[in-house]
């Protein structure tokens, strides 16, 4: 696609920039910076926001989540299609068609871009996938996508090294953008600690989304061991997370009881949904009354929909004496960098992205771990050793003030150098402005062209002509999904026939699992002619009946059907 305008139009797809997630924070930071560049026009494709909803941002923005109830109903019972909807698969085509970008920049986990390489627009724009790869062995889909996009970027050097070891030499690391200007040691730190009644405590902190890959049981066990070995130390564990998320995360109160830990020694962050005030105190359930504004049942522990602002989060970091981040694997783990910038020594599992943050030259100390395999994927995962957590906590507690200051200063400088918005955006601009379209080798193009020369008859030869029905719908994802939901009804109308669904290859996955579709056939323009499909004169055609729901009668004669179509309308 040639550029006909002075600015480079960049469509950026990721979590909505106002979401309180790692991807959301990164999205906000890079969009604010790219928007200021006179050579770049940014457009946001916001995952998590319904398509068609007004989004108040300084730049052009579109929600990617389906708003069509028919599509939502069609994907509801299929987990893979439901996940695709959450990642914007069914609306990204319409957004690309509207804004006609020069560059597509996708920032999500790699599975968010499943089948994107088969989309019609993929070869027309420069494509950059900036993804999080957090475990070994590298996911097969990442290895398949890398040669098909113009540039693959990863969030952690761990992933870059693994990809290059497998022959993918152009992969580069660009860390997620941390606006460290919000995070720094505060002069009124002691006043804040006194306000929240932790002024005499050794506070261990962990900021995280409550999900199973965050090693909460390991941390609680390490905390318990530290307390048992150091009974004279008044210790608190501050878990800044969504305690109420028990269905997909950890039931933290249950683990406290199981491990015999005093509920008063483990703190939670509460946020008022009316006045936005926050409180750090022992967990006592959700939907509490607000002591600041008097609101009823409006105070909950922080969650991805409602958290604290950056200023308040920095205050929470300043309540801590040390930051501890045990996890099974991760793409970057932004709270680690925030904690460093806020003046904390960070204890981090040295696996996956942890290798970018765990060592002394990075302002941290590594946590030992043992390997286990994730049953469903066979990925190598880390289970952090509670004994190592205990030992590192003791090391920090007993560390001299000069050694602490040196390590903290190292961490602050490291974040500014490696993870700053300026550094990240500078690298992104380089790739946006300089990446070239991959050129296929002539011999490869020829082989692929030959492979695509498949005769339609090859799909039809096992079914007699009089038993064939064609449904032709080349695009888009939403229309294909809706049509797919009608195939059972079509089969009931024509029980003696086999249904052949004709669509573009990028939509095969939406159809393949439908038991009422006999075969899926790749679309070509020849399928636009009803006479070619159903026959005329001496030409018998390819199907007994063919339906072209995307064609208007004013455009194409599409309602002949050899006089064999049926209807379900009854006149009384």
Model region roles, listed by residue range:
Residues 328:
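Aromatic "clamp/platform" in nucleotide-sugar-dependent glycosyltransferases that forms part
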Residues 443-572:
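Catalytic machinery of carbohydrate-active enzymes
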Residues 384, 401-432:
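A charged, aromatic-enriched C-terminal amphipathic alpha-helix characteristic of glycosyltransferases
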Residues 249-311, 315:
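Nucleotide-activated donor-binding/catalytic signature segment of Leloir-type glycosyltransferases, i.e.
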Residues 139-141, 164-165, 178-195, 250:
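Acidic anion/phosphate-binding donor-loop and adjacent secondary structure
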Residues 11-12, 198-214, 220-223, 237-239:
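Conserved donor-binding/catalytic core segment of Leloir-type glycosyltransferases
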Residues 158, 177:
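Carbohydrate-associated surface elements
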């Amino acid at each position: 696609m040639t550029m006909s305008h002075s600015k480079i139009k960049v469509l950026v797809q990721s979590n909505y920039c106002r979401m309180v997630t790692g991807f959301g924070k990164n999205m906000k930071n890079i969009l604010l910076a790219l928007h200021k560049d006179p050579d770049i026009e940014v457009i946001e494709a916001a995952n998590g926001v319904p398509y068609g909803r007004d989004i108040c941002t300084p730049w052009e923005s579109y929600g990617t989540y389906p708003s069509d109830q028919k599509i939502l109903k069609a994907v509801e019972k299929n987990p893979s299609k439901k996940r695709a909807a959450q990642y914007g698969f069914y609306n990204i085509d319409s957004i690309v068609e509207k804004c006609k970008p020069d560059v597509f920049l996708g920032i999500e986990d790699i599975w968010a871009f499943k089948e994107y390489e088969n989309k019609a627009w993929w070869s027309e724009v420069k494509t950059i996938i900036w993804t999080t790869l957090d475990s070994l062995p590298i996911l097969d889909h990442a290895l398949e996508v890398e040669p098909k996009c113009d540039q693959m970027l990863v969030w952690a050097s761990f992933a870059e090294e693994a990809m290059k070891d497998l022959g993918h030499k152009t992969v580069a690391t660009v860390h997620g953008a941390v606006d460290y200007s919000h995070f720094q040691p505060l002069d009124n730190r002691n006043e804040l600690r006194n306000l929240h009644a932790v002024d005499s405590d050794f506070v261990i902190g962990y900021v995280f989304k409550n999900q199973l890959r965050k090693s909460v049981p390991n941390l609680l066990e390490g905390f318990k061991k530290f307390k048992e070995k150091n009974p004279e130390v008044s210790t608190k564990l501050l878990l800044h997370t969504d305690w109420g998320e028990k269905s997909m995360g950890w039931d933290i109160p249950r683990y406290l009881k199981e491990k015999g830990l005093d509920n008063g020694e483990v703190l939670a962050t509460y946020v008022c949904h009316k006045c936005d005030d926050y409180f750090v105190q022992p967990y006592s359930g959700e939907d509490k009354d607000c002591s600041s504004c008097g609101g009823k049942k409006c105070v909950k522990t922080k969650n991805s929909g409602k958290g604290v602002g950056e200023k308040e989060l920095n205050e929470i970091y300043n309540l801590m004496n040390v930051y501890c981040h045990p996890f099974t694997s991760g793409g970057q783990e932004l709270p680690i960098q925030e904690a460093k910038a806020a003046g904390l020594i960070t204890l981090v599992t040295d696996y996956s992205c942890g290798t970018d943050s765990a060592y002394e030259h990075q302002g941290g100390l590594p946590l030992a771990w043992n390997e286990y395999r994730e049953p469903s994927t066979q990925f190598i995962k880390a289970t952090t050793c509670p004994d190592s957590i205990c030992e590192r906590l003791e090391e920090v507690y007993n560390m001299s003030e000069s050694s602490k200051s040196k390590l903290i200063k190292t961490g602050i400088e490291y974040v500014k150098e490696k993870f700053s918005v300026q550094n990240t955006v500078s690298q992104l601009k380089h790739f946006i402005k300089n990446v070239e379209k991959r050129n296929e080798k002539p011999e490869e193009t020829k082989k692929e062209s030959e492979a695509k020369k498949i005769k339609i008859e090859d799909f039809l030869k096992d079914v007699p002509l009089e038993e064939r029905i064609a449904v032709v719908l080349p695009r888009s994802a939403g229309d294909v999904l809706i049509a797919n939901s009608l195939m059972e009804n079509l089969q009931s109308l024509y029980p003696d026939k086999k249904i052949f669904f004709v669509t573009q290859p990028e939509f095969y996955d939406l159809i393949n699992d439908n038991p009422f579709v006999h075969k899926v056939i790749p679309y070509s323009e020849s399928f636009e002619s009803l006479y070619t499909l159903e026959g005329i004169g001496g030409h018998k055609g390819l199907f007994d009946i063919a339906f072209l729901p995307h064609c208007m009668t004013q455009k194409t004669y599409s309602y002949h059907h050899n006089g064999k179509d049926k209807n379900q309308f009854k006149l009384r």
